[in-house]
Amino acid sequence: MQRSLSMSGKRHFIFAVSFVISTVCLTFSPANAAQKLSCTLVIDEASGDLLHREGSCDKAFAPMSTFKLPLAIMGYDADILLDATTPRWDYKPEFNGYKSQQKPTDPTIWLKDSIVWYSQELTRRLGESRFSDYVQRFDYGNKDVSGDPGKHNGLTHAWLASSLKISPEEQVRFLRRFLRGELPVSEDALEMTKAVVPHFEAGDWDVQGKTGTGSLSDAKGGKAPIGWFIGWATRDDRRVVFARLTVGARKGEQPAGPAARDEFLNTLPALSENF
């Protein structure tokens, strides 16, 4: 849980101010990408009460592949996505996808294997107007789908280390609205989206969630990994909503998103003893 620190004296004041400035710079300035930041946030789905908060949870970053969840809602609501296995789209060379993603993909595979080109083909079929309208109506993050300055690529790249940003606090608020049927879409769209979000186990919790992996560039050309894991966990009749974010963590064998996922799954059973 977060702790409040009592500070007195000039040195403590200077240290506190410096810390705040450096944290803000990490959010808005790639030059400080080497610094580390993390957040683990858990709220009760029914009441919205805070259950656990640790780290800097109000700083906004690109959602990366966690944005596939709202994209799925849009796709089902717009009748572009029809069920868990329809449509199944073939890969095309012009998609410029990673080699591992150059395969026929349906909504279940899309979420499970985090297929970037499927997201982009979905937004192309939505079109700029409908895509932007959904983001605005969802009140998702900063709602900026303009993309990279001067590139006019928001339709296919806004969520990929570009203009669209969201904080862990905003992620859990959005997810709670989704789970409670408070988004301005059809009930079928909500239920079909829930059906394709991957399942994981964490002790006696059934967890559904989506990872996201990206990076911040620093002034020297270095990269600081960004890892997301967002979703909900159910045990008996209790459901909680969570967001886990890491920025600048040491690179390991796993990409940052799956690493954030495994960290959360490993710690949830112990965390939930205090829920």
Curated annotation (Swiss-Prot):
Inhibited by clavulanic acid, sulbactam, tazobactam, and imipenem. Residues 1-33 form the signal peptide. InterPro entries: Bact_Transpept/Beta-Lactamase, Beta-lactam/transpept-like, Beta-lactam_class-D_AS, PCN-bd_Tpept. The active site is at 65 (acyl-ester intermediate). Keywords: Antibiotic resistance, Hydrolase, Signal. One of its GO terms (molecular function) is penicillin binding. The modification N6-carboxylysine is found at residue 68. Substrate binds at residues 210-212. GO terms for biological process: antibiotic catabolic process; cell wall organization; response to antibiotic. Transmembrane segments: none annotated. Pfam families: Transpeptidase. Its EC number is 3.5.2.6. GO terms for cellular component: plasma membrane. It catalyses: a beta-lactam + H2O = a substituted beta-amino acid. The keyword Electron transport does not apply. Belongs to the class-D beta-lactamase family. Has a broad substrate profile, hydrolyzes amoxicillin, ticarcillin, cephalothin, ceftazidime, cefotaxime, and aztreonam, but not imipenem or cephamycins. This is Beta-lactamase OXA-18.
